């Protein structure tokens, strides 16, 4: 079973983007956190290391992780076999569109209908039901698109609605996988800003392999 958050951690203040929030005993501060205003979708090529370490961690209970981070690789292949690749990341926080929808709204419009596209997403958690529905509709009408989604955690996987949505993704031809430790290392090397004084090598957290196996089993049970 995946590592649960320790009791001490549960007693600590909620965090935003991996940074601790102080003075939560202040009623006004609590109100600010509960009534967060909409944020814009953020795009870029590399995300801060502390975001990655907090948001992508494959824990069972994702307390405080109220964003979706989506790192993407787009490979476009012409009829002649030439391949062009691009990559970047998207993040959301209480935005109108989730990161998955933002990809379709801001990245996909640049696609050339004459090319074939293989898109890989590395997402901090699996899609919600609404985003899964959007993915299914997009795949059904975009015949030159193949999509592989690798997720760090399963979002609300015990909910029947979520389970049904994940099965629909599979039926639509979307390949859905749980991230292995090697996938987290790939993100670290290719999508994370290497801050001054930060170790260049990826340092796996405790139970990363155990948690991968836990989620892999859950996903297999859902998709069978």
Swiss-Prot record:
Q: Where does Zn(2+) bind?
A: 60, 98, 128, 131
**Cofactors, names only:** Zn(2+)
> In the record's cofactor note, how is the cofactor described as bound?
Binds 1 Zn(2+) ion per subunit.
Single annotated GO MF: RNA binding
Which residues are named in the active-site annotation? 100
The Gene Ontology CC terms held by the record are: cytoplasm; nucleus
* PROSITE patterns recorded: CYT_DCMP_DEAMINASES_2
What is catalyzed by this enzyme?
A: cytidine(6666) in apoB mRNA + H2O + H(+) = uridine(6666) in apoB mRNA + NH4(+)
Q: Where is this region: Disordered?
A: 1-25
Keywords of the record: Hydrolase, Metal-binding, mRNA processing, Zinc
Which Gene3D superfamilies does this chain map to?
Cytidine Deaminase, domain 2
EC number in record: 3.5.4.36
Q: Where is the CMP/dCMP-type deaminase domain?
A: 64-169
Give the CDD domains listed for this entry: cytidine_deaminase
Q: Per its database record, what is this protein's job? A: Probable C to U editing enzyme whose physiological substrate is not yet known. Does not display detectable apoB mRNA editing. Has a low intrinsic cytidine deaminase activity. May play a role in the epigenetic regulation of gene expression through the process of active DNA demethylation.
| Subunit composition and interactions | Homotetramer.
Q: Which family does it belong to?
A: Belongs to the cytidine and deoxycytidylate deaminase family.
The name this protein goes by in its record:
Probable C->U-editing enzyme APOBEC-2
**Whose protein is this, by species?**
Bos taurus (Bovine)
Q: Which gene encodes it?
A: APOBEC2
């Amino acid at each position: 079973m995946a590592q649960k958050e320790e009791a001490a951690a549960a007693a600590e203040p909620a965090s935003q983007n991996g940074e601790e929030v102080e003075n939560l005993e202040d009623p006004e501060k609590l109100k600010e956190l509960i009534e967060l205003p909409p944020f814009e979708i953020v795009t870029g090529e590399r995300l801060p290391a502390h975001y990655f370490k907090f948001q992508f961690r494959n824990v069972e209970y994702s307390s405080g992780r109220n964003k979706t981070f989506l790192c993407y690789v787009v490979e476009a292949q012409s009829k002649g076999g030439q391949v062009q690749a691009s990559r970047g990341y998207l993040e959301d926080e209480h935005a109108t569109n989730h990161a998955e929808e933002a990809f379709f709204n801001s990245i996909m419009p640049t696609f050339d209908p004459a090319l074939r596209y293989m898109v890989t997403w590395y997402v901090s958690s699996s899609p919600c039901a609404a985003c899964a529905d959007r993915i299914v509709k997009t795949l059904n009408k975009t015949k030159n698109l193949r999509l592989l989604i690798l997720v760090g955690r399963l979002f609300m996987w015990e909910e029947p609605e979520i389970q049904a949505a994940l099965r629909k993704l599979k039926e639509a031809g979307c390949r859905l996988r749980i991230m292995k430790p090697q996938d987290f290392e790939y993100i670290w090397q290719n999508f994370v800003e290497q801050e001054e004084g930060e170790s260049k090598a990826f340092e796996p957290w405790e139970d990363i392999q155990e948690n991968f196996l836990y989620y892999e089993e859950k996903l297999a049970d859902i998709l069978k």
